[in-house]
Amino acid sequence: MKKWIALLLAVAMMAMLGACAAPAAPAATEAPAATEAATQAPAATPEPTVAPLEAAEVQLFIAASLEGAFKEIIPLYNESQPNVTITYNADSSGTLLTQVQEGFACDVFFSAAVSQVKTLEDEGYMIANSRVDLLGNKLALITLKGSGTAVTGFADLAKAKSIALADGSVPAGKYTRQLLIKLGMLDGTKEAKDYTTADVSAALGGVEINECSNVSKVKEAVKEGSNEVGTVYYSDAYSVKDDVDILEVADNTLTGDILYPVCRVNNPEATAAQSAAADDFIAFLQTDAVKAIFEKYMFII
């Protein structure tokens, strides 16, 4: 009997020792919750509608430097959406902003600078989350072919007899003034856009300056020989490359990034069909076919 008890105790002891020696099975762990950044897919580029849209007229405001490209883009859009009429208004971004503020009907606003679109957003004109920074550009200094100018680049602008220059409310004019600040020709005591034409003339030794209301007028003034040199976007310069020489293209470290944002604008008079067509047109502007047109006109994608 004692032997049986001893044997049972020995077996029990061995079982207890085995339990203590064996490692505890790991508890099942829950997969870590994925972070929002990891699970949230990047916003997809919207696709334009394939089916024909209802008849509508979209009011499009575009920076003057975009006009050439849009003369190709709008007919291309109408190949797939013949019921939609795109009516465009091309001028300086500053003028277009003022028109929106004054109550002009606008559905889509395509600026040559961020500041105008930021103002639309701050003042409640822009539809939330509709802004797309679609294009880039650079500032160029041009002269008529055979002009014989002594100017070789921005650094010796003072050698010009006359300069065509957009005013400070025009993005190209503001970028030019920013460049002159960076080069030490303007003193930098105020914002670039606030330097008047007279300020710029005085800083350049009294050179005659033809103040232009948009960049297209600068381009035409140089192309026609009315002014010796002028500052325009590279895309503008390239569009008249047979008539002008490009003296210099400025690095964006001198001008700041030149971005072209497009956005939707609150239009209280717009019908549902008009709003749908405006949204669709912005989606169309982001397609490869349209990007190819912008690249053809030397915009930066």
Please give the residue ranges for each predicted region:
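Positively charged n-region of N-terminal signal peptides that target proteins for export
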Residues: 1-9
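Exported/periplasmic ABC-transporter solute-binding proteins
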Residues: 4, 21, 28, 33-34, ...
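C-terminal motif of bacterial Sec signal peptides marking the signal peptidase cleavage site
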Residues: 15-19
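Short acidic/polar micro-motifs at solvent-exposed secondary-structure junctions
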Residues: 97
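Short beta-strand-centered segments that line the small-molecule binding cleft or hinge
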Residues: 103, 107-113, 117-123, 127-133
